[in-house]
Design a protein with these regions (language model features):
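Charged, E/D/K/R/S-rich low-complexity terminal regions of large eukaryotic assembly subunits
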Residues: 1-51, 55-238
C-alpha cells in the first residue's frame, strides 16, 4: 500500500512538469513541424507552446514572427477550422493594425475565415493581392483556401440556426457559398467526412438535416450574438 501511495505521488509530480520543460518540448515540436511544412501540427504545437510562456517576454521581433507563422498555419492547416484560440491570444496583437504591423492584412484574413464570410474574403483577396502573392504558401494552396473558406461559410449558416431547426435548403446554401447545387452536395460530403457535422442529405427534397456540429470556441462578438438571440427567444416565449 505504501509503494502504491508513492507511485501515485510520483505520477502526480510527473504530471506537474516544470512549465519551462513543457514550453521547450512544444517549441521544439513546433520548429520540427515548421521545417516539415506540417501546418496543422505546427499550429497545434505553437498554441500549446503559448500556454506555457508569456508572449510579451519573447521580444517584439520573435513574437511577430511567431504570430505570422501561426496565422499562416491556421489558414493552411488541414482540418484547422477553429481560429479563436489564436485570435483571442495576445500573440495576435503583434500583427494587428494597432501595432502598425505590415501583417495587419494577415490578421484580417484569419478573422474573415473565423467569420466564414466569403464576400469579405473575396474583397480581401482583391485588396491585398500584392501581399498575398508575396506569400508562396498561400499562392500554392489558393484552391484549398477557397475550399476551406467555403466550408466555413456553410458552418456559419449552421451555427446561426437553433440546434433543433438545422434543416437547410441546398439552394440557400448555394447562395451563401456561391456554389451550384451539385457543388453544395460535394461541399456537404467534404464537411461530413471531415467530422465537422453529422446529419443526412435529403436529395429528394434538396435539403440537409444537421443533427450535430463540432463545438467551437467563441469570441466575445459571437458570445454577444448568442446572448442577443437568447433574449429574442425569451421575448417570444414570454
Amino acid at each position: 500500500e505504501v509503494n502504491k501511495s508513492h507511485q501515485k505521488e510520483d505520477l502526480f509530480l510527473w504530471k506537474q512538469a516544470d512549465p519551462t520543460v513543457s514550453a521547450a518540448f512544444h517549441y521544439l515540436a513546433a520548429q520540427l513541424y515548421k521545417h516539415e511544412r506540417d501546418f496543422a501540427n505546427f499550429y497545434k504545437s505553437g498554441i500549446l507552446y503559448l500556454a506555457y510562456v508569456d508572449c510579451m517576454t519573447l521580444g517584439e521581433d520573435v513574437a511577430q514572427e511567431l504570430a505570422v507563422d501561426l496565422a499562416l498555419a491556421a489558414l493552411l492547416g488541414e482540418n484547422v477550422f477553429n481560429f479563436a484560440e489564436f485570435l483571442a491570444h495576445p500573440i495576435s496583437k503583434f500583427i494587428s493594425k494597432e501595432s502598425k504591423s505590415e501583417f495587419g492584412w494577415l490578421l484580417d484574413m484569419v478573422q474573415v475565415f473565423n467569420d466564414g464570410d466569403l464576400n469579405a474574403y473575396d474583397e480581401l483577396c482583391e485588396k491585398y493581392a500584392d501581399q498575398l502573392n508575396a506569400q508562396p504558401a498561400l499562392v500554392m494552396h489558393e484552391r484549398k483556401l477557397r475550399e476551406k473558406i467555403t466550408i466555413l461559410a456553410f458552418l456559419r449558416i449552421v451555427f446561426e440556426l437553433p440546434a433543433e431547426k438545422r434543416e437547410i435548403e441546398l439552394a440557400d446554401i448555394a447562395v451563401r457559398t456561391k456554389l451550384s447545387v451539385d457543388g453544395v452536395e460535394f461541399l456537404l460530403m467534404k464537411t461530413l467526412s471531415a467530422g465537422l457535422i453529422e446529419g443526412e442529405i435529403d436529395e429528394v427534397s434538396s435539403k440537409v438535416v444537421v443533427t450535430w456540429a463540432q463545438p467551437r470556441i467563441l469570441l466575445k462578438p459571437e458570445i454577444q450574438e448568442l446572448a442577443d438571440r437568447l433574449d429574442q427567444w425569451i421575448q417570444k416565449v414570454s
